[in-house]
């Protein structure tokens, strides 16, 4: 088996968050409150060459957690990531 070629540096050019909510048939009641839907936050990162990668952010509780985490990504984390160069996952 041949070794993998070295990784090329990743240079994020754009970071976006997408909040989705899926209604559930029966609300889930816990000590944190009642959930009437299941939230999800998907993250899209595009590099300076146009390659795109997707990820997600855990956001089950509290109910407003999905919007809060999406806003944190776009206002705090994205400015720290965009335009920098990353040699690898470490």
Give short role names for the model-derived ranges.
Residues 7, 46-90:
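Metal- or metallocofactor-binding catalytic centers and their adjacent structured scaffolds
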């Amino acid at each position: 088996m041949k070794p993998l070629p070295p990784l090329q540096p990743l240079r994020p050019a754009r970071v976006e968050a997408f909040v989705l909510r899926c209604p559930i048939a029966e609300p889930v009641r816990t000590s944190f409150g009642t959930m009437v839907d299941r939230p999800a936050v998907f993250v899209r990162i595009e590099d300076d060459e146009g390659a795109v990668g997707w990820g997600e952010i855990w956001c089950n509780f509290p109910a407003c957690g999905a919007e809060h985490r999406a806003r944190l990504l776009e206002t705090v984390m994205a400015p720290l990531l965009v335009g920098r160069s990353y040699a690898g996952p470490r």
